[in-house]
């Protein structure tokens, strides 16, 4: 088994706060494989507006309307995406397999268990998403792209 592997150093996307942590994991991953991010950002530039009556008060509702599915964008640029539900017992082996195949794993975690998140570690549960781009079995560590706080832009 390989002891160390880094698929490539990810460049964080911190120009703006974009949607949520999933996209802040996805955008650097997409940039790693394509060299650019515009297709993802421009895909969501379409907006839908509607007026709804909420408690008898007309309210303007704005929604993003993606012009293409993300699957179509990935396929267009030759990126293969595989969604997996993995038990925590198999998560490490599965992630290492993805990295050994030159992929990047984007996983959901609970910040309560992540020491890097000083604001939430052992304090409260918060769902989060991180990209994993490398590992070092000699130190039992993964290389991840992460911010310092729950609402920080990485």
Regions flagged by a language model, labelled:
Residues 2-88:
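Cysteine-nucleophile protease catalytic domains, especially the papain-like/related folds used
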Residues 136-154:
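Noncatalytic regulatory segments and standalone regulatory/sensor domains
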Residues 73-86, 121-126, 144-150:
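Hydrophobic transmembrane alpha-helix bundles
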Residues 33-56, 88-141:
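Active-site-adjacent substructure of cysteine-protease-like catalytic cores
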């Amino acid at each position: 088994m390989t002891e160390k592997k880094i698929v490539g150093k990810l460049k964080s996307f911190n120009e703006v706060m974009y949607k949520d942590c999933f996209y802040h994991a996805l955008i650097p991953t997409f940039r790693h494989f394509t060299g650019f991010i515009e297709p993802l950002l421009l895909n969501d530039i379409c907006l839908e507006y509607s007026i709804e009556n909420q408690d008898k008060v007309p309210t303007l509702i704005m929604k993003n309307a993606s012009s293409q599915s993300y699957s179509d964008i990935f396929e267009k640029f030759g990126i293969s995406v595989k969604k997996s539900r993995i038990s925590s017992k198999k998560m490490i082996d599965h992630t290492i397999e993805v990295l050994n195949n030159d992929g990047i794993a984007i996983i959901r975690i609970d910040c309560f268990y992540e020491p890097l998140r000083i604001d939430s570690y052992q304090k409260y549960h918060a769902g989060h998403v991180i990209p994993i781009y490398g590992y070092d079995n000699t130190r039992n560590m993964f290389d991840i792209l992460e911010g310092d706080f729950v609402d920080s832009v990485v």
